[in-house]
Amino acid sequence: MAKDPVRVLVTGAAGQIGYALVPMIARGVMLGADQPVILHMLDIPPAAEALNGVKMELVDAAFPLLKGVVATTDAVEACTGVNVAVMVGGFPRKEGMERKDVMSKNVSIYKSQASALEKHAAPNCKVLVVANPANTNALILKEYAPSIPEKNISCLTRLDHNRALGQISERLNVQVSDVKNVIIWGNHSSSQYPDVNHATVATPAGEKPVRELVADDAWLNGEFISTVQQRGAAIIKARKLSSALSAASSACDHIRDWVLGTPEGTWVSMGVYSDGSYNVPAGLIYSFPVACKNGEWSIVQGLPIDEFSRKKLDATAEELSEEKALAYSCLT
């Protein structure tokens, strides 16, 4: 029997991540090849014409799974009845701007979108925040949408997770699908900690630890970490635009695994509301290793954390606590 369509909201839909993301959703990359979707696209009034152009292209692409398109500049209309919300819209930092100025712009955006989602989205709506500062934007959204369960609000660190998988696969010259269980801890910023201590590679002789196969701790503890941390900046330098294709693809991965589940024995990285696991302060949106089942994530528990890792986990938590304080200071 045909499934009922799922309503998926993309904010900032006329932007370049939105432009890469909506065809992926319409093709079934996010929710599966048998799941019809209705796309809700929101952007700001100056982008209304461009947004309409994206809608025209979606019609022209004749996607079999796409059962409808709502393109609007009205947050209430955009949020009404949505089951999944991918928050790509935000205020990007421009040259010469202070962090606090950017933060205050994003706080006001996420405050108003939180209330639209809370009042109008479907009851069990899953929310993914992509716009930077992603962790803190998600935290503001959570604060201003108290009736949305905290387990339904997340931010994107799957892009960093996939970047880490990609670096290992290139270094070892193996298929990226054979590498698993890297972890991104903390903030989606250059303070994040890409951790390979529990990661493995499928080989003809069974699963082997990444550390053993790479056999170069200096690289794994140095250049590997900084490459993943700085990858976004490297892409901007090369493309003169921020990473859009990879961000869109990882947003699909994040939602797909959350809704449809992670394979047995595999975990992924998601920015979720901290409950104090791994001695990370509660009350932050922090990236953890998670496994997903029946539409719910749970933090993978009991992984040993060495001294090197502990320092990194604490440093990124500290940055998130500072961001949280800065965001709250914008609320007054």
From Swiss-Prot:
Family of the protein in this entry: Belongs to the LDH/MDH superfamily. MDH type 2 family.
Documented EC number(s): 1.1.1.37
Quaternary structure note: Homodimer.
Gene Ontology molecular function terms on file: L-malate dehydrogenase (NAD+) activity
Classification via Pfam families: Ldh_1_C, Ldh_1_N
Amino acids binding NAD(+): Q16, I17, D43, G90, Q113, N132
Protein name, per record: Malate dehydrogenase
